[in-house]
Amino acid sequence: MAPSQKALLVLVLSMLLTASDSWARRIDCKVFVFAPICRGVAAKRGGDSLSVGGSAELDDALTDPFLRSEEPREWRELTRLSRVLQTFLSHPTGETEQHD
């Protein structure tokens, strides 16, 4: 594979990863009912969330460990894809692994 093809592949994959909506951190309000985004009338109406102020940082500190433990399926797939691509790009052209 030519260097320009590798660069194009890396560019396309990086654009796909950065444009993906799955990267956005979402909170399930059924699970985290006291999260700042899930509080009040604005959250119940589904409109734009209101800024909660000083307690938002404290609430995020409490919910972040739970959010990290529930890694989305898309994130795992993208991580696996990036490992495969790193392995593919690290081998010189024409070199393949041989299994005995």
UniProtKB/Swiss-Prot annotation:
UniProt signal peptide: 1-24
GO cellular component terms attached to this protein's record: extracellular region
Propeptide: 44-100
Keyword Cytoplasm carried by entry: no
Reported tissue expression: Expressed by the venom duct.
Disulfide bridges in this chain: 29-38
UniProt GO molecular function: toxin activity
Superkingdom of the organism of origin: Eukaryota
Keywords for this protein: Cleavage on pair of basic residues, Disulfide bond, Neurotoxin, Secreted, Signal, Toxin
Keyword Disulfide bond assigned: yes
UniProt-annotated location(s): Secreted
Oligomer and partners: Monomer.
Function field: May mimic the function of prey elevenin neuropeptide. In vivo, intracranial injection in mice induces hyperactivity (tested at 5 and 10 nM).
Domain notes: The cysteine framework is C-C.
Further facts: Negative results: has no effect on six different human nAChR subtypes including alpha-1-beta-1-epsilon-delta-epsilon/CHRNA1-CHRNB1-CHRND-CHRNE, alpha-3-beta-2/CHRNA3-CHRNB2, alpha-3-beta-4/CHRNA3-CHRNB4, alpha-4-beta-2/CHRNA4-CHRNB2, alpha-7/CHRNA7 and alpha-9-alpha-10/CHRNA9-CHRNA10, when tested at 1 uM.
Family in the record: Belongs to the elevenin family.
Protein name per its UniProtKB record: Elevenin-Vc1
Source species taxonomy: Eukaryota, Metazoa, Spiralia, Lophotrochozoa, Mollusca
